[in-house]
Amino acid sequence: MRTIISLLLLSAMVFAVIEAISLEEGLQLFEGERGCVGENQQCADWAGPHCCSGLRCKELSIWDSRCLG
């Protein structure tokens, strides 16, 4: 019985890791498709500000907004 429970837990952990990797790859692909921009680049605001992962759009002035960490 302990062996079965251990195998089930191990399977669940492996599945969770595989799902996390797949999700991360999917997010990276989505960022490329929507035209994310890197640090200190002007925010891509055609459909709302889109900065790459870990960055956020910071409004420096009325006319200038940049992606910053």
From Swiss-Prot:
Superkingdom assignment: Eukaryota
PTM: Does not contain a cysteine at position 61 which disrupts the cysteine framework.
Disulfide bonds: C36-C52, C43-C57
This protein's GO CC annotations: extracellular region
Propeptide: 21-34
Pfam families according to UniProt: Toxin_7
A GO MF term: toxin activity
Summary of the tissues where the protein is detected: Expressed by the venom gland.
Leader peptide range in chain numbering: 1-20
Main location class: secreted
Compartmental location: Secreted
This protein's UniProt keywords: Amidation, Disulfide bond, Secreted, Signal, Toxin
Family note: Belongs to the neurotoxin 01 (U2-agtx) family.
The protein's name: U5-agatoxin-Ao1a
Species this chain originates from: Agelena orientalis
